[in-house]
Amino acid sequence: MLVNLTRRNLLKGSAAVGGFVFGVQSGSVGLMNSVAEAATGSFDAGLYVTINNDGSTVITCARSEMGQGVRTSLPMIVADELEADWSRCSVVQADGDQKWVDAGQELDTDGSRSVRRDIKRLRTAGAAARMMLEQAGAKKWNVPVSEITSQNHTVTHTKSGRSADYGELVGIASGLSVPAESDVQVKDRSEWKYINNESAFTPDKYVDLMDMTTGKGIYGADVILP
């Protein structure tokens, strides 16, 4: 569920931030609205997706990797709806703060339910970000947003053929309002590139695969208490 998004502003890009930031709070898609907080890493809610001015995209995973591939599957859900180029995405791990989950929930990873539990809000988050980038493209070229498409980290005006990388649009997108939940348009299943697509999980796309298969990965079981 999106909470009060129509009254929130997208985090404004600045030299300190270099892009815009999406967040998750209380199990809902939200946005950070303080540049000062962004610069210091102190947020009311967890950092979720960052798109930088160079187009590089950082997705935060709030579930724990235990060899099941959750650090690939969950960020790929966001990337799919965002129409992001996976090769330009990186994944960082969330901390253990309760801000990542609804009140009364545990920030745990168990029962093979991470995707089932999070897929709806992750899809919504990615789709909302994509729509804002499309709106930014429409504003940049002064054309109707209905003439704008997005694919593979690029926004295109179909009639003129003009295009812009996501990184070129973060400044404009930072001044736009977040779409209401009822207006967020997620992809049809037939349009999925990563979700439910086994071919997307090739070794080169799998986060941490080399570390997991060579024994370099660090897990909770590796912790030795003094």
Locations of regions flagged by a protein language model:
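Cofactor-binding beta-sheet edge motifs in enzyme active sites
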Residues: 2-23, 32-226
